[in-house]
Design a protein with these regions (language model features):
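Conserved proline-anchored active-site loop of SAM-dependent methyltransferases
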Residues: 83-102, 156, 377-392
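Conserved Class I SAM-dependent methyltransferase catalytic core
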Residues: 116-169, 422-439
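Flexible, glycine-/basic-rich loop-and-beta segments that form/coincide
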Residues: 177-241, 461-476
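PRPP-dependent phosphoribosyltransferase catalytic core
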Residues: 393, 397-562
Length: 562
């Protein structure tokens, strides 16, 4: 059997080995040159084709379920959603060797020589695309177990940068205590990386295991600024008239005993303020900040962490800084977030067969950490559709308008060519979650409302776009590019949506529709896509002033990239 090195002489081979040894560094290395190429990799354009029959609810649709290889879907989304996704959650195949990782339509088993390299290459290609989709303040969560946690961590560092890591969360699972392992595993991991950690907002969440009586739920944080020690020598602060008090009316008594701070005389408080100025003596923390507060006329100021801060004197004479508490207390151990067993039972009640789904509560919590109530949430290993279920549940609870994008392959293999996980599990679950259903016990379960468009990826050679790309695919790509919900292509030659229009041909009736639409548009705000901008510009004449005329398929090809 020949290989690519057979024709090389001894000295050339030695040179190759020396260069390889010199390049090897501490870190993640996988056999990219030796493994079987991923058949999903291609340079074709990827169109998204709507299947209205498998969609749910009435158009227009804000949520998307995409059937196809996620490498293709991610490239299509890079064209339409680059920099627009606030939160990504994925639960990729765990690569245990137990028929959980499909590569080139075949399961990769434990005996495969390059099992880990195949998995790393597969993930690397997709994570690179995912990074481009994240908004500047976006975050990605990746579930993983012990089999690949260390390799995945190094891979995430390579793709996103080690300085972008927010946390390695540990999710306490129910575990499998029936097996004979010496140590029973009762946890998995969730790696969290931010596009830009410095602008990732403080999570507006308190761990659900914190009791409601905890001080974490108080609206303010109060701490005395008295601090005596070698680094905080005794000094004076003058509190002028008008300095705030923590009570409305009364007397703060002179303090000249062992207590700090020392107060030279009794002070009267009226209407929540000192009636006259007084000198107080102590060692201080935040003395400079307190004096800035005084100099600023007792208006709230920002501390070093950007928190609103004010200062008050209490009835006992203590000086306190008072900070507005943000409801944020996220810890790295995730407990009581549901279980795969409970959510498996939920799917059984829906009459949907799927093993080991992630708990809705877990993903709901992660989304709450990472996004606001208008965020778009992406899952490109959608499985049973738990991420979309979590989004719908959150919206129902807080009235939010989050949107989901799910990507799932059919998971058909050589042995199961008719399998379609996306259609029969993922989309079917969401039809029932949103529309309501009767469970296997005969009980009626109310829907959470909402709908989704069901799309399929379709590869088209870039040089054949003008011939192979149909008008509906163009229209849907343009709607997504302009952050519009998807609607049906009207089967004519013209469609418009807000300030967006697509002229598919130059029939007189369709050009007239364009004229009518332009009369309703804001000056300078209209974008018209056409297959011949030169011809359209000639037809419109002065009407084209202030209108953006964009050429097809060139514009889509350029946005799609490589």
């Amino acid at each position: 059997m020949t290989n690519k090195y057979d024709h090389l002489d001894r000295q050339t081979l030695i040179g190759l080995l020396q260069r390889r040894d010199a390049e090897r560094q501490l870190g993640l290395v996988w056999e990219r040159d030796e493994i079987e190429a991923d058949q999903a990799l291609n340079d074709d354009f990827v169109a998204l084709s709507l299947d209205a029959g498998l969609s749910h609810g009435e158009a227009p649709w804000e949520n998307l379920i995409i059937e196809g290889d996620n490498y293709d879907a991610l490239r299509a989304l890079r064209m339409t959603h680059k920099g627009a996704i606030r939160c990504i959650y994925i639960d990729p195949p765990y690569n245990t060797g137990n028929k959980d990782f499909v590569y080139n339509d075949r399961f990769v088993d434990k005996t495969h020589r390059f099992r880990h390299s195949l998995w790393l290459e597969f993930m690397y290609r997709r994570l690179q695309l995912a990074k481009e989709l994240l908004a500047d303040d976006g975050v990605i969560f990746v579930s993983i177990d012990d089999n690949e946690i260390f390799r995945l961590g190094m891979l995430m560092d390579r793709v996103f940068g080690s300085d972008r890591k927010l946390a390695c969360l540990t999710w306490q699972t129910d575990g499998n205590f029936d097996n004979q392992a010496k140590i029973k595993i009762a946890h998995e991991y969730v790696l969290a990386y931010a596009k830009n950690p410095e602008i990732f907002p403080m999570p507006a969440m308190v761990d659900p295991n914190v009791p409601s009586t905890s001080k974490l739920f108080r609206s303010e944080i109060r701490n005395t600024i008295v601090k005596n020690g070698p680094k905080n020598p005794v000094s004076e602060i003058f509190l002028p008239a008008g300095f705030p008090a923590s009570f409305n009316e009364g007397i703060v008594h002179k303090r000249n005993d062992e207590r700090w701070p020392k107060i030279e005389r009794d002070i009267c408080v009226l209407n929540g303020c000192l009636e006259s100025g007084v000198v107080v003596r102590s060692g201080w923390a935040n003395k400079d900040l307190c004096q800035k507060f005084i100099a600023g006329g007792f208006e709230n100021i920002k501390d070093s962490k950007g928190q609103d801060t004010r200062f008050e004197i209490t009835s006992t004479g203590a000086i306190e800084n008072v900070k507005v508490r943000s409801a944020s207390h996220v810890i790295s151990v995730l407990r009581n977030m549901g279980s795969t067993q409970a959510d498996s039972s939920l799917l059984v009640d829906m009459d949907i067969q799927f093993t080991y789904p992630k708990p809705v509560n877990l993903i709901q919590y992660l989304i709450s950490i990472a996004s606001d109530d208008k965020a778009t949430v992406l899952d490109f290993f959608a499985g049973s559709g738990t991420t979309a279920h979590a989004v719908a549940k959150l919206n129902a609870e807080d009235g939010g308008n989050r949107k989901f994008i799910l990507v799932s392959s059919t998971e058909a293999t050589e042995d199961t060519p008719d399998k379609n996980l996306c259609r029969d599990v993922c989309a079917e679950r969401m039809r029932r979650v949103l529309g309501g259903y009767t469970n296997t016990k005969g009980q009626s379960v109310e829907g959470l409302d909402g709908g989704f468009a069901y799309l399929r990826t379709r590869r088209i050679p870039k040089h054949r776009l003008a011939l192979k790309l149909d008008h509906a695919e163009v229209w849907h790509a343009l709607q997504l590019l302009h952050s519009r919900p998807l609607s049906h292509w009207p089967s004519g030659g013209f469609a418009s949506d807000g300030e967006l229009a697509y002229l598919a041909d130059f029939q007189a009736a369709h050009v007239e529709q364009l004229y009518e639409w332009l009369r309703t548009c804001t000056a300078g705000g209209a974008s018209v896509y056409t297959w011949s901008t030169e011809r359209l510009n000639g037809l419109l004449g002065e009407t084209a002033a202030g209108v953006s005329l964009l050429p097809l398929p060139h514009y889509l090809r350029e946005r799609f990239g490589h």
